Regions:
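Residues in well-ordered alpha-helical elements
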Residues: 24, 62, 91, 110, ...
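The conserved cystathionine-beta-synthase
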Residues: 1-5, 12-13, 54-72, 79, ...
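Conserved small-residue-rich
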Residues: 42-102
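Bateman (tandem CBS) regulatory domains
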Residues: 39-52, 106-116
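Juxtadomain coupling helices with adjacent low-complexity linkers
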Residues: 25, 30-43, 53, 127, ...
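Short beta->alpha transition motifs characteristic of CBS
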Residues: 6-10, 17-32, 73-77, 84-99, ...
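Short N-terminal micro-motifs specific to bacterial/archaeal maturation
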Residues: 17, 52-55, 84-85, 103, ...
């Protein structure tokens, strides 16, 4: 999934598709199977993407999509007068622009953004998935001392789980 940059895999049996596996399925499996193994170093801020992409709320959806593609990310924070006022994600773009047949070059981000979900960076990683599930989102804005310090995605969480529980538990070596 990671090497192909996809979030869903078709499961086949005898050349027939029998199911669909999502990155969210992996995160749920690892989180609830091994949550007792989380230690002090497994804090959200350690694994959050620190490069914070921002764009003005009056920019177009097309411009935001271009920036997200250029940086290979699934979200961008939206600001107004240097304050973060929203977040635009791939899912939001597809649901509010593409599915509605709108021209991305004429859609302002202020009309498609969501209110960002915030999570304290000092919390353990299992709280990140709980927060995502509770709010039905795949991207959470990480804060430290009431300031935005990064963004963590379901993809980041899955990569963390893979390293933590596949490598560390199988080989006894820390990540």
């Amino acid at each position: 999934m990671r090497s192909e940059n996809v979030r869903h895999l078709a499961i086949s049996e005898k050349e027939k598709i029998v199911g669909l596996l999502s990155i969210k399925d992996f995160a749920n499996y690892y989180n609830f199977k091994f949550c007792a193994v989380i230690n002090e170093t497994d804090r959200v801020s350690r694994y959050a993407e620190e490069e914070i992409l921002k764009i003005d709320c009056e920019a177009t959806a097309l411009h935001a999509a271009e920036i997200m593609c250029d940086h290979n990310v699934g979200s961008i924070l939206v600001e107004k007068e240097n304050d973060i006022v929203g977040i635009v994600t791939e899912r939001g773009f597809s649901q509010r622009v593409v599915a509605d047949g709108l021209d991305a070059n004429n859609v302002k981000l202020s009309s498609i953004m969501n209110k960002p979900v915030l999570l304290d960076g000092h919390l353990p990683m299992d709280e990140a998935l709980s927060c995502m599930r509770k709010n039905n989102v795949r991207h959470v804005v990480v804060t430290e001392d009431n300031k935005i310090s990064g963004v963590i995605s379901i993809k980041d969480l899955t990569i963390y789980c893979k390293h933590k529980f596949v490598y560390e538990l199988d080989f006894g070596e820390p990540i």
